[in-house]
Amino acid sequence: MSVIAGEIVEPYAAALMSLAQSKDLTDKFAEDVRSLINILDESPEFKQFVGNPVIKQEDKKAVVKRMLGEQVDPLMRNFLMLLIDKGRITFLEQIGKQYLALLRELNQTVLAEVTSTVELNENQKNTIRERVKSMTSAREVEIETKVDPSILGGVIIKIGSQIIDSSLQGQLRRIGISLKTL
């Protein structure tokens, strides 16, 4: 994230967290934020629409209200209208991710980004959760999964700046390096 984006994203995310805490809605807002991020990921057209500076704010508001309906909390809807009014709606995804990071910090939860060759089942996710808990001081572990067949097998787990590479691709790379040193 650029410095300018950080200067925009962090205050809005902190304000959203403050509002959520004051109304005891941190978990509801987290649900709403995840839904919004999914909408942005799944609909490049919507992302482009809200980010287009040529489109009038009133048109953006109407589309956002129509699209979300009653799915999000009214306070979250008001926050989105504020972002549109201030011309900051293009930062919605980053603000949402920063909000989730603040919530994880508040709840002493770590994010484990797991890359595997196939979709993980619940037992595998629970095993990873327990392993990550034992490695960190976190009370809870949130898992974000990504499927990447190029790792050939195994998993890659990223926790903050720490990476645990137990993929077949990583093992082959390490074997190749050790053979070169012989």
UniProtKB/Swiss-Prot annotation:
A Pfam family of this chain: OSCP
Disulfide bonds listed in the record: none
Main location as per UniProt: membrane
Keywords tagged on the record: ATP synthesis, CF(1), Hydrogen ion transport, Ion transport, Membrane, Thylakoid, Transport
Highest taxon of source: Bacteria
Alphabetized GO MF terms: proton-transporting ATP synthase activity, rotational mechanism
Gene3D superfamilies attached to this UniProt entry: N-terminal domain of the delta subunit of the F1F0-ATP synthase
Cellular component per GO, a single term: plasma membrane-derived thylakoid membrane
InterPro entries reported for this sequence: ATP_synth_OSCP/delta_N_sf, ATPase_OSCP/d_CS, ATPase_OSCP/dsu
Function per UniProt: F(1)F(0) ATP synthase produces ATP from ADP in the presence of a proton or sodium gradient. F-type ATPases consist of two structural domains, F(1) containing the extramembraneous catalytic core and F(0) containing the membrane proton channel, linked together by a central stalk and a peripheral stalk. During catalysis, ATP synthesis in the catalytic domain of F(1) is coupled via a rotary mechanism of the central stalk subunits to proton translocation.
Family: Belongs to the ATPase delta chain family.
Name recorded for this polypeptide: ATP synthase subunit delta
Organism: Trichodesmium erythraeum (strain IMS101)
Lineage, uppermost ranks: Bacteria, Bacillati, Cyanobacteriota, Cyanophyceae, Oscillatoriophycideae
